[in-house]
Amino acid sequence: MKLSLESIINDAAAWQAKGVALPKFDIAAMRKRTAETPQWVHFGAGNIFRGFIGSLSQRLLDAGLAETGIIACDTFDFEVIDKIYTANDSLTLNVLLNPDGTTSREVLAGVAEGLKADFSDCAAAERLRAIFRAPSLQMLSFTITEKGYAIRGTDGSLLPVVQSDMTAGPQAPRHVMSITAALLLERFRAGALPMAVVAMDNCSHNGEKLMKAVLEIAEAWVANGLADEGFIAYLKDESKISFPWTMIDKITPRPHPRVEKSLADDGFEGMAPIVTDKKTFIAAFVNAEKPQYLVVEDKFPNGRPALEKAGVYFCDRETVNMTERMKVTTCLNPLHTAMSMYGCLLGYTLICDEMKDEDIVNLVKRLGYVEGLPVVVDPKIVSPKAFIDEVVNDRLPNPFMPDDPRRIATDTSQKVGIRFGETVKSYIAAGKDLNDLVAIPLAIAGWFRYLLAVNDNGEAFEVSPDPLKEEFQSKLAGIVWNDPSSYKGQLSALLANESVFHVDYTKTPLAKRIEEYFVKLLAGPGSARKLLQDELK
């Protein structure tokens, strides 16, 4: 069996015999209607889109709650369209990885068409422009990763490709933000038609990031005489163009060899992953965890699909922000970082294996339930306690989720402030006793100990990339693992760094506790495990 329209229609019984759910709607009719009256375009045609956003479209189509599908575009890696979309008739075999090790399979057909957003191809460019002139278009959504919204480098200067787009104008844009601006200009010229422009990537205030990038490019075009003055007013008028904020949460790892083998063993052809020239790792199937959350600011000037019927939460901007803070400061991200520091020290390479370690599980539970929940931001639409329960009991232990603590340890200096400092600030604001905090100082001491690049057995390891790695390691100079007396107060200056930690720990009793924990972590083989056991009894 090969993933194709012909196969799922003519050999439906064979697919179903292998436990694969099939679409319940007329795919050809949906595609015809989408071509005539497009409603939803998506930029970023990778795995999170195919397995999550594409499945939302399928839910609505299956239930008769939508008549059109999504037009999926890739703005970065055109091989994905040729080798995955076109090769498989724009179908995806979605495999959900259940915590008990079982899987659920479904063919997703919610994508009507796969396009290349390639403005050097006249036909592709005109097809996109025609879609954006359609009065029926309601939404352009994105899953392009956080860096896709960046039009400036780390030094603050414009990326050369963006500078080139600003000078050349909207005819042949190359950067995804320039392409977005060009298509919105097309819509403006077609009668200032309304629509929503929706970032769905996992970054704080994503709608604001998207809006600022598009506006900066548009303003350059106006200044260079390449677009009308009214274009800026159009982009800033929320009754015309909105940039809703969102919170997304779903882990969609690379295609897993075990999943590929199980599909091949069941007679599915063409499931081997490919790696494109741009290093996209992708296959005809997507594997992902079952839990998923999408919270969206309900600001859609031209209407929207009934996605609330597919499990999407719609609310105001403040609730989106609160849901994101709940996840990032309490219910998921702090747990990930704390367990990854000690996971690396204890030699783990899989998060699911860490969840079999009683000492690490005690750290995770203390951090989330005992220290985090009392000051959690409660968005009301999602229960923080239920969210943590799912993380601890289902998501982190899932043996099919091949997540690695070394990946999570990347860029920790950019994360310790939001993931731990905000909870400390909440304790201070509420007048709560900071001496009650054990897991947070353990996590921070664990990070400093991790930066010494020696595990709990005294073996060297490679510290994950981090923009402040060299700076912090240089300030830890002179500290020697297996020699607690080598600590001479080197942490004090670091703990006062409010820009990194979001709080000056030297003005709190926690600095002393972090230093005490750190010294104990220098005591030789087994000291990390002993510290966890002693403090989390």
Where are these regions (language model features)?
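Substrate/ligand-engaging "lid" and interaction regions
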Residues: 1-43, 47-537
